[in-house]
Amino acid sequence: MTRELRVPPPPSSGATDRQQLRNQARRAGAHQRTGARRPTLWLAALVVALGIVLCGLLLVVAPSLLGTGIDGRINLLLLGIDRRGGTGWAYRTDTIMVATLDPDTQEAGILSIPRDLQLTIPGYGQDRINTANVYGSLQDNPDGGPALLEATIEANFAIPIDGYLMIDFRSFEQIVDTLGGIEIEVSTRLHDTRYPDPKPEDPFAYKTIHFEPGLQHMDGSKALEYARSRMSTSDFDRAKRQQLVLLAIREKALSLSAIPRWPKLAAVAIDSIRTDLETHELLALALSAARLDASKVKQVVLEHPLVFSHRRADGAAVQLPRWDLINPVLVDLFGPQVVQ
């Protein structure tokens, strides 16, 4: 079964690129948003402390504050990048997730999309999905990268996106350390001899990291290593570990011991978050996140057999979707309206 791709024409230049791009890929009836912004200091403290800027638990939201997607369902795009000391945001996305909530049933879920999944990027043809943020940023629009990613997901998966949150993973370390570390139940031994460890004298240096099974306390550096390592297992296992780490961050952030740490968390957040959500929407998310029962959140990774490995003519290794297998998963997570 092949999904029909709805591909808009290439974006034009100018300040309205983001709205034009999203409007072309969005189905009738979905709302529009303004450009990216940073949370104010006081609000960032609340948002970060509740884990909202980091994970797919951005799901229990007052429905009146967010536009409707599929039959009132709310879908948020969650992105992680590694700026490696840079100041811009035009980098390939290292983590791509879609968080979803049905406000009527309170059913929630997180979909992890592999960064090497090849899809049609509106206006740019077939390429890995993690390149969309770079292509969109080439339009001289700071909000263009996430806009193109949203359009790509909408065009290929038929999932309307209501907003995005993007975080720099280097600040992720600081956030975990500010929380005093997190507890992770490591299920499988992990040994990676080629974990990237760039240095000024050798930007391509590696180091060895190792995790034994069992409950472990991790600081920011260890948590990031555990979430991002891919050489000893697979990119799909990596996506599952990322979801576990994000759940652990939320658990710690919601603890009473985290309350005195909120001001410092806010300071870390100011330079590490981009979002197109309005201030009142962020506040609604923060106030509602604590009510979510994390044990009931569906966690899905697009992995084999939902996708299969392929080598392109240029030698690049990518993953290709099996829509006949993916569609039932999307229906279960997002509702029947996503399959047309």
Question: What are the roles of these predicted feature ranges?
Answer:
Residues 2-340:
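Non-catalytic, solvent-exposed segments at the cell envelope interface
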